[in-house]
Amino acid sequence: MVQGDIADCINASATEVGVFGHGYTYSGHPLGCAVASKVIDIYQRDNIFEHADSVGEYLQTRLQALADHPLIGEVSGLGMIGAVELVADKASKKPFDGMKVGQFCAKAAEENGLIVRPLGGNRVAVCPPLIIENEHVDELIDKLSAALNVTLDWVRAEKLV
C-alpha cells in the first residue's frame, strides 16, 4: 500500500485538518450524492415515473404500428426504450450483413432531426427523455418512419434486398 514519504505527507495533512479526506466522484462523493438526492426529489415531486409509465405505453403502441414496414423484422421495447430490427427478408427475418443498414437508417433519422442509436444486428433504438409528451412520440415515430422509408429506398438501390 502507501508507504514512506507519500504516507507521511497524507498523514500530516490528515492530522492538520482532522480528517483523512478521500473518495471518488462516482463512489459516494457528498456532492454527487446531494445532486442525486435532489434529482430523486424532483422526479417524485413532478411524478416523472408515473408520466414516463403512461407515455411509455403510448410509445410502445406507436412503435408496434411500425411492425408492418417492409424492413422491420421485429419491434421490441419496454417503457421509454424501444428498438426496431431491420431485416433483409421480412418473411424469414433474414438479417442484413454487418451494421451498415442500421447505421444508414440512424444517419437518415439524424438528417430528419431525430437521434437514434444503431445497435448490433441492425437494430435501431430510441430512448427519449422521460419528460416527453405523446405529441413528441408522434413526431418521433413520424421521423423514424420517414428514415425507414429512405433506408428502404437505399437498400433497394444498393441491391441489398
What name fits each language-model region?
Residues 1-161:
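Conserved N-terminal phosphate-binding loop of PLP-dependent enzymes in the Aspartate aminotransferase
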